[in-house]
Every structure is written in structure tokens, then in C-alpha cells.
């Protein structure tokens, strides 16, 4: 896995200049990069997968359509002394999918939740929430993003990864001191 700093730099560059960037073209010239939580080594885990009977599920999306994922197991860890269980899914392509909401959702982070890419290493899964990211829907309408199912709504805060994306309107209001933050 590339370093966190390299990952963030590459992502910011893609969002500002990439032809596939979800940020509207008219906002890219003023895009100064995403806001992130500081790196937190306590939010990195290497955990075994507790397999569950595989089941295909329909996920709601931000556009109202449905997407199919397969539930493959549960991952357990602790955050601030609180036990947490999160469900891991698999897309039709075979890639793992870990969508979640947490106690920061709708406050410091995107309200609909974030995603985390995970890798399997020697039978365990590496979860590094410092790499948690917003779905494209956080940046612009017109995308159909799977919403985290209720079983992945965590009660603990995951203060790691990407924070809320602020559009130009929000940034202008902040500059004028009109924000409630």
C-alpha cells in the first residue's frame, strides 16, 4: 500500500485535474485539496474474517437504484475501548467493499457514509481507516453511490480519513464568517 501522504496527494491531484474527477469542472480551478483527519495509527487493524453464510443483498443507492453485493463476513476490532463489528461485502467484480457510517457522519464527514478499500494478507484483512474516503456523490450529483447498510452504521467515531467536502458556496460562506462551525 502506498504511503498515506502519497495517497492523499495523488487523490487531490486527480480531483483537481483528472478527466474522470467527480468535482464539477467549474469548481476545479479553486479546488485546494481535500480536508483530512490527522493520521491515527490506532485506527489501523489486521483482523481475521468471521465468515457468514454468503448472501446476495440489494443495496440502496443515492440515485434510488439498487446494486447487488455479497455479504461474506464480519470483521471485529475495538475503537476507544468499544468493540466494533463491521460487515465485509464483495462486488460482482470480486473486489471487497466496506461501506460504513459512524458517529462523525453528517458532522465532520459525509452524511451518507464513507468507504474503505481492504486487502487480505495471510488470511487476515487490513483495515486502515486513515484511507477512508467519500463516495463520488459527496462531490457532485449525478452519481449512483451505494449507501452503507444499517449493519455498518457504527456508534463509535472513526476520526480518520477524508472529512466532508466543502463546495465553493460553503467555502465562500466560511470566508464571510457566516458558517456555524
Region roles according to the model:
Residues 1-55, 176-181:
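N-terminal domain-onset segments
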Residues 26-29, 54-71, 87, 124, ...:
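Extracellular/lumen-exposed scaffold segments
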Residues 41, 71-73, 82, 94-96, ...:
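A generic structural signal for short beta-strands and their flanking turns/coil linkers
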Residues 59-111:
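Mid-length scaffold segments of soluble, non-membrane domains
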Residues 102-133:
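Acidic, glycine-rich flexible loop segments
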Residues 133-181:
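Extended, aromatic/histidine-rich regions of cofactor-dependent oxidoreductases associated
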Amino acid at each position: 500500500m502506498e504511503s498515506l501522504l502519497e495517497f492523499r496527494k495523488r487523490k487531490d491531484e486527480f480531483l483537481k485535474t483528472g478527466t474522470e474527477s467527480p468535482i464539477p469542472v467549474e469548481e476545479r480551478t479553486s479546488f485546494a485539496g481535500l480536508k483530512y483527519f490527522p493520521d491515527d495509527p490506532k485506527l489501523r487493524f489486521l483482523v481475521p474474517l468471521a465468515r457468514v453464510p454468503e448472501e446476495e443483498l440489494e443495496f440502496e443507492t443515492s440515485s434510488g437504484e439498487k446494486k447487488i453485493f455479497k455479504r461474506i463476513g464480519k470483521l471485529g476490532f475495538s475503537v476507544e475501548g468499544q468493540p466494533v463489528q463491521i460487515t465485509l461485502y464483495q462486488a460482482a467484480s470480486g473486489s471487497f467493499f466496506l461501506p460504513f457510517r459512524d458517529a462523525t457522519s453528517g458532522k465532520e464527514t459525509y452524511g451518507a457514509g464513507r468507504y474503505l478499500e481492504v486487502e487480505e494478507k495471510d488470511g487476515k484483512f487490513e483495515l486502515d481507516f486513515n484511507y477512508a474516503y467519500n463516495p463520488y456523490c459527496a462531490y457532485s450529483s449525478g452519481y449512483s453511490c451505494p449507501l452503507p447498510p444499517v449493519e455498518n452504521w457504527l456508534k463509535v467515531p472513526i476520526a480518520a480519513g477524508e472529512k466532508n467536502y466543502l463546495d465553493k458556496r460553503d467555502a465562500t460562506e466560511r470566508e464571510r464568517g457566516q458558517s456555524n462551525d
